[in-house]
A protein has these predicted regions:
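Intrinsically disordered, low-complexity polar/charged tails and linkers
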Residues: 1-302
Length: 302
């Protein structure tokens, strides 16, 4: 965004809607608080009394008037509910980051099938982290709604900087449709295609490889480039598993991703007679879904 954010002031001012609200809104917010002042802790507890639903996780509590650190409290505060809180029977409590707060935003799904939840991390510098974005339209939709919510709190001048948006990581996966002999494929990748690969079934179930993309090169081979070209090459990792699943991860744009996908698709088609595991086809077991009961108490007229 175009200005820093006072995370403590803004966090407590952001309205959290009830989970059952059928509209685009903030349904949950989260922050990590650290204080050495008992009065500040009382103020936080007083603010929490005005919230309909909250969860307070105590990470650290020191109250020793005779010690070097006389008083210190670290809290992780969750206000509101999201889909995971309701569907998951056991919600593992995770740690949070300082200098930021997290928002769970509900937006309309562009496919027209109801709503979906987006995870937004807002830092005190004004930087945003939004994982799970699949289209540019979804990103614009999230940013516009966030700015609309922040304007009454921060000021009408707040906006996001349009030319300072970057893709940090793209995760992509596909399945080739047949089971793979990993030992044979590992040898082919390493010695025939000369791609940097590593395979140890005891430590990781898939073949871990690195694809080096060199901009401007018409025929991309994925091999480690010479020393004079290494600074221009992009390193993208891909993993191939026994079941035929392929995972591509790394910092790249969509053109590079499609290039690697076409390379792997062609490789898996051409090497099928050698690496296809026709005999060891294991039918997946049918897993019986165990229904768990979770009790949610709704208290009205507070």
């Amino acid at each position: 965004m175009n200005q820093p954010i006072d995370i403590k002031k803004v966090f407590w001012s952001i309205p959290v809607s009830v989970y059952s609200t059928p509209s685009e809104c903030i349904i949950k917010k989260q922050i990590k608080v650290s204080t050495t002042d008992p009065k500040e802790l009382e103020e936080i507890r007083e603010l929490l009394k005005h919230e309909k639903y909250y969860q307070e996780q105590e990470i650290e509590h020191i109250d020793n008037p005779e010690g070097r650190i006389k008083f210190k409290v670290q809290l992780k505060i969750n206000v509101g509910l999201c889909k995971k809180d309701i569907l998951n029977y056991r919600c593992k409590l995770k740690r949070a980051f300082f200098n930021c707060f997290v928002l769970i935003m509900r937006i309309r799904d562009q496919s027209g099938e109801g709503f979906k939840e987006m995870h937004i991390k807002v830092f005190n510098t004004g930087k945003l982290e939004i994982p799970g974005i699949q289209t540019d339209e979804s990103l614009t939709q999230v940013l516009n709604l966030l700015i609309t919510i922040l304007k009454p709190i921060v000021g009408q001048d707040i906006d996001f900087i349009h030319d300072k948006c970057e893709t940090v990581l793209i995760n992509s996966n596909f399945n080739c449709g047949y089971f793979i002999n990993r030992d044979k494929l590992y040898n082919i990748l390493k010695y025939k295609y000369r791609i940097n690969s590593n395979y140890d079934a005891c430590s990781y179930p898939g073949i871990q490889s690195k694809f080096y993309y060199i901009p401007g090169l018409e025929n991309q081979t994925g091999q480690h480039p010479p020393a004079n070209e290494i600074h221009t090459a992009s390193e993208i990792s891909f993993m191939i598993f026994r079941t035929g699943s392929v995972l591509i991860v790394g910092r790249c744009d969509e053109n590079v991703l499609h290039c690697i996908y076409d390379f792997l698709k062609k490789l898996l088609e051409e090497e099928y007679p050698e690496i296809g595991n026709h005999l060891n086809i294991i039918q997946p077991k049918k897993q019986n879904v165990k229904l768990r009961r979770k009790v949610i108490n709704v208290v009205e007229n507070i």
